[in-house]
Curated annotation (Swiss-Prot):
Region (Disordered): 1-28, 62-589
Gene name, Swiss-Prot/TrEMBL: Bcas1
Chain positions with Phosphoserine modification: 127, 192, 314, 381, 482, 557
Oligomeric and partner information: Homodimer. Interacts with DYNLL1 and DYNLL2.
Biased composition range(s): Polar residues: 330-356, 532-545
Segments of skewed composition (Basic and acidic residues): 12-22, 198-207, 214-226, 243-254, 357-366, 418-438, 494-511
Keyword flag Phosphoprotein: yes
Paired cysteines (S-S): none
Biased composition (Low complexity): 166-185
Protein name per its UniProtKB record: Breast carcinoma-amplified sequence 1 homolog
Organism: Rattus norvegicus
Subcellular location, record wording: Cytoplasm
A biological process from GO: myelination
């Protein structure tokens, strides 16, 4: 289109000097090419839309290209008044992006034009209006970048200036990415702002606020690019033959750059948005943690409240009931039972808080400091028949009460004393406490079982050792009761050693049997049980009737082991008549 209109103008203007000729060519190109730069810019921006956003919207292209064209037109109008001798601008409103300087082209500064980014897209499209005179396949077979640095032999006087024009036209291909980087990030962020509005991502609201300054930066960079070429001096001469082919190749290169370069800002945009997503997740996590911190002090307050409220209510409830101390325990169990039922009814949040309070309240106190809801239910239990409801609900809630009693031994002992005083009113509590007794000490029971296994061999070793010592000295009966006196103090330290000592006692059992075959005097059997009777009575007073038998066997095993060590060492040191007992005694050392 532009070529057909500019060709008839060229022969009429050839009468002028070559300078005026070159100025005329460039001015004619500008006058003819009214809408071409706008079209090319829309193509480039349309490729940005395709690569970055995947949307071909001409509505977005026109307002995006219009401020650029308006700025370029304003500067071009200001500079177009002094383009040359014969230059007469026809349509100033539709001038291209690039503009011509006042001075003649400086031959040494064609490479300085590379800083112009927005004008580069304009220069790429200016040339096709000239006449097709110098279409040399040798020069244009390759890319214009390859043809730019080496000046080929010129056929026309304007060819040197055309070479210099090709250099800034091709050299901006390298710095053209700043333009694309200035335009592309602003456009994806405009589009992503719509995405944020539709996706309702509150965490990314900071990004749209950042997009307007970046658009401002892009416009500033374009203005600087427009102002920059005025200093180094832009060549005016344009050879028609080269620029037709070069412009087509440059369009292709701009298209390829528009495919390749904006992809990087897109990645940059995604990488910029990724930390925002992370920040959004961190903000959500921080919000959840903040709610957790709000919830956890409430739990601690609810844990503290029952202690205060129950401490206030515990003396008042027996005053309302006008009963003995034993009547306080069914109320405690009723409070735990009813509060456990009531806590399941209101909702999940109170149930979670009350379960935690029930656990820690059970650790601190046995019954009364379990739940804050027990206050209300205790008032109901005062109005109702306390004993019947207590019996029914304790039958339902035996396991939690057992766990509470397992955790604290002292509270169970106190409640056992209370139930022994009045067992008729509280049969269920007695059952619960009797069941909690054997479960209370599983570790002690395990140690007792280990001690029971080795107790038989150890008692026999006691007898045999007593017999050996009676053979040696006549005061054996006096010596044998003497070591068990410090036994109760040493038993606490040696409960951990019982398992290892039981293994040794099995080895000593064979030696004890051999000694028993040699010496058949049952003299030392009596003093050891006599010494252990008071300890058995103390255990009976503390822990009841079931445990003292096992504890008696355990004490016998420890005492017998200590007794067995002393006389056998005496035998080994003095007489050494018993070779069988030397081996296990050496192991015990």
């Amino acid at each position: 289109m532009g070529n057909q209109m500019s060709v008839p103008l060229r022969p009429g203007d050839q009468e002028h000097d070559p300078e005026a000729d070159t100025y005329k060519v460039t001015s004619d190109n500008e006058c003819v090419q009214n809408g071409i730069p706008v079209v090319v810019s829309t193509r480039v921006i349309q490729h940005y839309e395709e690569v970055d956003l995947g949307i071909n919207s001409l509505k977005d292209n026109v307002p995006a290209s219009s401020p650029e064209t308006m700025e370029a037109h304003a500067v071009a109008d200001a500079s177009g008044k002094n383009l040359g001798k014969g230059s007469k601008p026809k349509a100033p409103a539709a001038r291209s992006h690039f503009f011509l300087t006042l001075s003649r082209p400086v031959p040494g500064r064609p490479g300085d034009q590379g800083t112009d980014s927005s004008a580069a897209s304009g220069r790429l499209d200016v040339s096709p209006g000239t006449a097709p005179e110098n279409k040399d396949p040798s020069e244009h077979g390759a890319l214009p970048v390859a043809a730019a640095p080496g000046p080929a032999p010129d056929k026309t006087p304007g060819c040197t200036e055309a070479k210099q024009q090709t250099l800034p036209a091709t050299s901006p291909l390298a710095p053209s990415p700043p333009e694309s980087q200035a335009e592309a990030p602003s456009r994806p962020k405009d589009f992503s702002f719509l995405n944020r509005l539709f996706k309702l991502d509150k965490g990314r609201e900071s990004a749209p606020a950042d997009s307007p300054p970046e658009e401002g930066k892009g416009s500033k960079s374009q203005e600087r690019a427009i102002e920059a070429p005025a200093v180094p001096g832009n060549p005016h001469g344009v050879s028609a033959g080269k620029d037709i082919v070069d412009s087509e190749e440059r369009k292709q290169e701009v298209d390829t750059l528009s495919y390749s370069v904006p992809a990087d800002p897109e990645v940059l945009g995604t990488t910029k948005e990724d930390p925002q997503v992370v920040d959004a997740t961190e903000n959500s996590n921080s919000i959840m943690s903040f709610f957790k911190t709000l919830v956890s002090p409430n739990k601690t307050e609810t844990k503290k409240d029952p202690e205060d409220t129950d401490a206030e209510n515990s003396p008042t409830t027996p005053a309302n009931l006008k009963s003995d101390k034993a009547d306080l325990t069914p109320q405690e169990t009723q409070g735990t039972a009813k509060s456990s039922k009531g806590s399941s009814q209101p909702g999940q949040a109170p149930s979670a808080g009350t379960s935690d309070t029930a656990r820690e309240g059970g650790k601190e106190k046995a019954g009364p400091t379990s739940l804050p809801l027990g206050k209300l239910f205790w008032k109901k239990s005062v109005k109702e028949d306390s004993l019947s409801t207590g019996a029914e609900e304790n039958a339902v809630c035996e396991p939690p009460v057992e766990t509470v009693r397992l955790e604290e031994v002292e509270s169970t002992l106190q409640t056992v004393d209370l139930t022994e005083k009045e067992t008729q009113t509280e049969p269920t509590d007695v059952k619960v406490k009797e069941e909690s007794k054997p479960r209370r000490t599983p570790l002690m029971a395990f140690l007792r079982q280990m001690s029971v296994r080795g107790s038989e061999g150890i008692t026999r070793s006691e007898e045999s050792n007593g017999k050996d010592s009676s053979c040696q000295t006549s005061n054996s009966t006096e010596k044998t009761p003497s070591p068990p006196e410090p036994e109760p103090a040493g038993t606490a330290q040696k409960n951990k050693e019982t398992s290892s000592k039981d293994k040794k006692s099995v080895d000593k059992k064979s030696a004890a049997e051999s000694n028993k075959q040699k010496n058949g005097k049952p003299e030392a059997r009596e003093p050891a049980p006599c010494v252990q009777q008071p300890t058995v009575e103390v255990n009976a007073l503390q822990t009841g009737d079931k445990t003292p038998k096992r504890s008696e066997k355990r004490r016998q095993s420890l005492g017998g082991f200590l007794k067995g060590l002393g006389p056998k060492r005496m035998l080994d040191a003095q007489v050494q008549t018993d070779p069988v007992s030397i081996g296990p005694v050496g192991k015990s050392k």
